[in-house]
């Protein structure tokens, strides 16, 4: 391995809120966690009441100071675009009707006429 490019991998202590200390190795250094295997309900089989009320209060106090969102600007009436859409639909329908009539008139004689390459059996 090259020297000087790898991070320092040192002994680390992970401190839990319950008081448990886990010794491991990391590049981070010492750090604190809220729940570990000693106090997590899955491992202990005991139910733990989380401090959700405190979290809600912190959220409310944090966002109470922010101003309310401004009302959205009023939009112009959408009557004209609706008329344009209707006109475009009518134009497409008229074009399809014309195209359908011309295709039918071309297709009918071709179906009645025998093919030049067809061999009688």
Swiss-Prot record:
* Record Pfam families: Ribosomal_L31 (PF01197)
The record lists Zn(2+) as bound by 16, 18, 36, 39
Q: Which cofactor does it need?
A: Zn(2+)
For this UniProt entry, what's an example GO CC term? ribosome
Summarize the protein's role.
Answer: Binds the 23S rRNA.
The record's region (Disordered) falls at 65-121
Show the segment(s) annotated as Large ribosomal subunit protein bL31.
Answer: 1-97
Mind telling me which Gene3D superfamilies this protein's record contains? Ribosomal protein L31
| Stretches for region Unknown | 74-121
Q: Where is the composition biased (Basic and acidic residues)?
A: 81-93
Q: Which SUPFAM superfamilies match?
A: L28p-like
Q: Does the keyword Transcription apply?
A: no
Q: Where in the sequence does UniProt note compositional bias of the Low complexity kind?
A: 65-80, 107-121
Protein name, please?
Large ribosomal subunit protein bL31
């Amino acid at each position: 391995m090259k020297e000087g490019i790898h991070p320092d991998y040192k002994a680390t202590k992970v401190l839990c809120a319950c008081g448990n200390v886990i010794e491991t190795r990391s590049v981070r250094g010492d750090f604190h966690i809220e729940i570990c295997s000693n106090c997590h309900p899955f491992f202990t089989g005991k139910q733990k009441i989380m401090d959700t009320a405190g979290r809600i209060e912190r959220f409310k106090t944090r966002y109470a100071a922010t101003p309310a969102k401004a009302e959205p600007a009023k939009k112009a009436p959408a009557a004209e675009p609706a008329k344009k859409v209707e006109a475009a639909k009518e134009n497409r329908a008229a074009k399809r009707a014309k195209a359908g009539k011309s295709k039918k008139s071309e297709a009918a004689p071709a179906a009645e006429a025998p093919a030049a390459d067809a061999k009688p059996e």
